[in-house]
From Swiss-Prot:
Cofactor binding note from Swiss-Prot or TrEMBL: Binds 1 Mo-molybdopterin (Mo-MPT) cofactor per subunit.
Protein name as it appears in the record: Protein-methionine-sulfoxide reductase catalytic subunit MsrP
Single GO MF descriptor: molybdopterin cofactor binding
Cofactor(s) the protein needs: Mo-molybdopterin
Keyword Signal appears in the UniProt entry: yes
Binding annotation for Mo-molybdopterin: 88, 91-92, 146, 181, 233, 238, 249-251
Amino acid sequence: MKKIRPLTEADVTAESAFFMQRRQVLKALGISAAALSLPSTAQADLFSWFKGNDRPKAPAGKPLEFSQPAAWRSDLALTPEDKVTGYNNFYEFGLDKADPAANAGSLKTEPWTLKISGEVAKPFTLDYDDLTHRFPLEERIYRMRCVEAWSMVVPWIGFPLYKLLAQAQPTSHAKYVAFETLYAPDDMPGQKDRFIGGGLKYPYVEGLRLDEAMHPLTLMTVGVYGKALPPQNGAPIRLIVPWKYGFKGIKSIVSIKLTRERPPTTWNLSAPNEYGFYANVNPHVDHPRWSQATERFIGSGGILDVQRQPTLLFNGYANEVASLYRGLNLRENF
């Protein structure tokens, strides 16, 4: 894998700068192109980090048993655990990046049922214990790229989705895989209150082509940093597709259904001109409101310590996945 250059310490801004208007401050930091086009909630998150506001501490999950295959090791600089668990998009618990860690404690993950159905010869159901014991777990260090033009490097723990699908035995009619998040308005306040949940239609749904789902990089994820996923990161099981934007990584999954037709996906339903079905990371295809050519890597420091870096096609996984899209116009099929 290509190396990401190490982050460097940035000079501390004078105290007087904190009294500038938010947009002036963000422009002074050189992040106007993307950040000033983001929703006000995302801008507020950036400004909170700029001021050094503390992020909530996530409860520790139980330790998991897993292997560390050499193929998935990396010398990329990891994003610190407190950033991975404290800076999240999970609108079911609020719009601010700190809201999931603050509010997701209400999510009940035991018992849990994950149903695999649709165009399969052998539909089946997994319970909570199956999620961490039915398939061997392995740690994979992946880049994670948000559509909002920020990125992390995360040591996820899980198993390849293809192993689960192989047990279900897809029929010849299966062309897509549809995913659905838990619908529990009493536990997920954003599902009950449109103001809290960003006006999205719930439950959250996502989808992949079958060949994307069967790719070895596609991971059903149950842990991070050696422990079970905390609720704010999508406990007890979520999807990670490292060459796609983060909103494809549906969280707290209760249903996987193989289908003949392309399934609807939440953000595409909400704003089809901004969020496509494929959502492949592509520096040459901008979001209508900001550039995707560069990204902010979230490392050990606050926003003053972050430097922009070039966005990599397919998030740096082009050698592994570009063949999936041979002949497909990536600008039209964004």
